[in-house]
């Protein structure tokens, strides 16, 4: 609430002025999805992510508590998680989202990083995954069930209420998308000198 960082422009200026005074915090360790968001923001600011200060917490709730207490200056977690904390009374400010377009719901007024002039996108994809030994028939049955569910008005309403962007891939299309994202992640991990299991 009392943070001098009120916009992405302020955040970038603070990082450039003295990166040691800008501590990122999130649920997840170095190399995690939330760390990657912080690293991409640091890189967009001209800072080598290896020089970035990052505190890993057990989860987003702990990180948001640390943010409110001034122990970290930036929370690089899920927008939907921040939204729930704001609804519960947390005094935090969402600066931008890393999706390709604005979210719906209560976060619809929050700009994307791209809108603000930073080519940074890192949407978190949530899904249900099955093991490799599941039969084709069972895989298709589950895929069809999720496809039908995601086409309902009730699902669309719930998704919008949770600040989640529209994303309705299932089956082979989702599998291909995840493999493409993993290739991007592996390249970024190599750029950031992280080791990734093959």
Segments predicted by a language model, with ranges:
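Conserved functional loop/turn residues at catalytic and ligand-binding sites
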Residues: 7, 70-71, 89, 117, ...
